[in-house]
Amino acid sequence: MTLRFGLELVDRLARPLLVIILTIVLIWKGPIFLPIAYSTSGPTILYPGLSFPASFRFAPDGRIFFTEKNTGNIRIIQNGTLVPSPFASLTVATDGLEQGLLGIALSPSFQSDGFVYVYYMGWDGTTYHGRIARFTALGNSGTGRVSIFDVADPTPSTTNHDGGYLRFGPDGKLYVQVGEFADPSQSQNSSSVAGKILRMNPDGTVPSDNPFPNSLVYALGIRNGFGMDFDGQTGQLVETEAGPDRDDEINLIVAGGNYGWPICMDTCSNPSFINPIASFAPVVTPSGIAYASPRRYYFGEWTSASLQKLTLTQSSTVASISQVWSSPNPYNGVTDVVLGPDQKIYFSTSTEIYQYDFSGSAEPTQPSSSWTVIYVAIAVAAVAIAIVLVVSRLRHQKTIDSGPNPLSSVFTFLAARVSG
């Protein structure tokens, strides 16, 4: 009696559950995708054995200029080979992990003026300085060094949060990420260039159309960023920013925008601050980011030693973030990401430069939450079907219906949805 009662109870619960789950599946308006195994060739190492390439850029003739973070050398790769002698060398402060020779940018008019810009941390005997030097390329040698920017670290005893990333915008201006030098109060200090994104003319002077009169400041409330790029269609500036022990961010930068640090992190209710489009917890330390195609970016992660793909919606919200590659060496984090002249993604780690042909690649991605619901629904429906069949058999009853088996119709429908 007890066994029979238990079987009847299971049968009564399983049948309504089956009806509910199958109803959800049947009214679903989108196609039903089943998980498949993706294959992709993945990134390949082009240049191994490098000395901590912090940032790199392509010249119009195909040469790659890159900074060696800890040596202070600017190096060139030409025709697939590292040029033996440095393009130029700087004396840099390397007392902290985040110091050294950092960002690099080539003039938009490089073919005519040969200008190469680098950001580095220097030491004057008492204070650390964030500096931008400009060289003129004469073949593979840098000449005519000129200093166009210098900011003294407001907290001389600190050696981190130096920023240092450089990027020329479609407007021909030089954009600079400057960290707050481990002094959070600098980010909201309008008279300081620390904790900001700066916008300057190629000679270091203030553009007349900057959002704050007579100031290099373009955006404030920045903690410490080392990655930014411009949307190739809209010109939108996108930057990555490292948080403290949580809330790393990806931000859409607008002129005069305030991004909240240190008053708030991640999403803020204060309308004075602009919220990130993505935040990460725990930290991943996002680094270089590159626009690849409409609404698609690739960015590096230092902490997780990986390359990620960011896809945006038409309204510039995050559609998905998925991992494309991770280093077998967890200490070989990604430092910079660049779209090459061949429309392939290039990225550097602490020892190599990689190439990734993302066009036509079937990249491994995580299913969206809506597809996850469908996967779970199908799985639960399968369990419910199994329960009904087992219970019916144990009770030695007749078939569910004297007519055509409804389960057969369901499986036929699902098969048609999947194949269509």
Residue ranges and their predicted role:
Residues 131-139, 190-202, 253-254:
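Beta-propeller blade signature
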Residues 386-420:
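C-terminal membrane-anchoring or membrane-association module
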Residues 33-184, 227-230, 235-243, 282-315, ...:
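Acidic, Gly/Ser/Thr-rich repeat motifs that build Ca2+-stabilized beta-propeller blades
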Residues 85-97, 145-159, 202-218, 260-280, ...:
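Surface-exposed loop and turn segments in beta-propeller and other repeat-based domains
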Residues 319-340:
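Conserved blade-ending motifs and adjacent loop-strand segments that build the rim/top face
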Residues 11-34:
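Hydrophobic secretory-pathway targeting helix
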Residues 365-379:
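Juxtamembrane/start-of-transmembrane alpha-helix segments at the extracytoplasmic/lumenal side
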Residues 176-194, 248-249:
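Short, conserved, GDST-rich strand-edge loop motifs in beta-rich repeat architectures
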